């Protein structure tokens, strides 16, 4: 590796809006995040992939179209 052309890596403590702190290696000097794995609904099990929001009936239309074919 050539000297002087690579950015300096440092261990940074990232602070989330919920108060959690995570340590990562980065070239940034400061990083703040709004949501982390401690407060995101997908990781907490209160929604995410298990929650389907369908306001226009697309899921029902799809199920009706392919009902009994597979």
From Swiss-Prot:
Requisite cofactors: Zn(2+)
Binding site for Zn(2+): 16, 18, 36, 39
Pfam families, sorted: Ribosomal_L31
Cofactor comment text: Binds 1 zinc ion per subunit.
One Gene Ontology term, aspect cellular component: ribonucleoprotein complex
Gene Ontology terms: biological process: translation
Single GO molecular function: structural constituent of ribosome
Keywords for the protein's UniProt record, in alphabetical order: Metal-binding, Ribonucleoprotein, Ribosomal protein, RNA-binding, rRNA-binding, Zinc
Gene3D superfamilies for this protein: Ribosomal protein L31
Top-level taxonomic group: Bacteria
Quaternary structure note: Part of the 50S ribosomal subunit.
Family as reported in the entry's similarity comment: Belongs to the bacterial ribosomal protein bL31 family. Type A subfamily.
Function noted in UniProt: Binds the 23S rRNA.
Protein's name in the database: Large ribosomal subunit protein bL31
Protein species of origin: Fervidobacterium nodosum (strain ATCC 35602 / DSM 5306 / Rt17-B1)
Gene name of the record: rpmE
């Amino acid at each position: 590796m050539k000297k002087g052309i690579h950015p300096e890596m440092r261990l940074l403590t990232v602070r989330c809006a919920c108060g959690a702190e995570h340590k990562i290696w980065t070239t940034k000097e400061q990083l703040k995040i709004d949501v982390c794995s401690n407060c995101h609904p997908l990781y907490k099990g209160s929604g995410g992939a298990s929650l389907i929001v369908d306001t226009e009936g697309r899921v029902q239309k799809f199920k009706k179209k392919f009902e009994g074919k597979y």
